[in-house]
Amino acid sequence: MLSVQPDTKPKGCAGCNRKIKDRYLLKALDKYWHEDCLKCACCDCRLGEVGSTLYTKANLILCRRDYLRLFGVTGNCAACSKLIPAFEMVMRAKENVYHLDCFACQLCNQRFCVGDKFFLKNNMILCQTDYEEGLMKEGYAPQVR
């Protein structure tokens, strides 16, 4: 929630760490901001202007477009075909969107952790082992460097 409050004593800006000496200051995520410093965490657009709407989730401050892109209704999961609600975190691979629990190799069901390599082949998510085995069956072996 964005609130504009009259400034009683200088507070530090969460964006630039400088004192806020403006007549009004902005408060979001229980932190104070200069008007120019309150920005979307994804696209850096300014959110401190009168009439701007901001959204907060997972300790992020977001504009409407990025909030909906990250957390909005995303359609159906590419793995299970069930609807993904707006409040649920998702994983994406190109244009495909997945529930976190569904983001796994579609051959061996190995779940992926942050930083794991995965491959998208014929609209299927594959782990590195299954991807390379598929390439071997097709007669192509990736070069190891």
From Swiss-Prot:
Entry's Gene Ontology BP terms:
positive regulation of transcription by RNA polymerase II
Gene Ontology terms, MF aspect: DNA-binding transcription factor binding; metal ion binding; transcription coactivator activity
- Keywords, alphabetical: LIM domain, Metal-binding, Repeat, Zinc
The record's InterPro entries line, in alphabetical order, gives: LMO_RBTN_TF, Znf_LIM
At the top level of its lineage, which domain of life is listed? Eukaryota
Entry keyword Disulfide bond: no
Keyword Zinc belongs to the record:
yes
GO cellular component: a single term: nucleus
**Which positions fall inside the LIM zinc-binding domain?**
11-73, 75-137
Task: Give the Pfam families listed for this entry.
Answer: LIM (PF00412)
The protein, known as:
LIM domain only protein 3
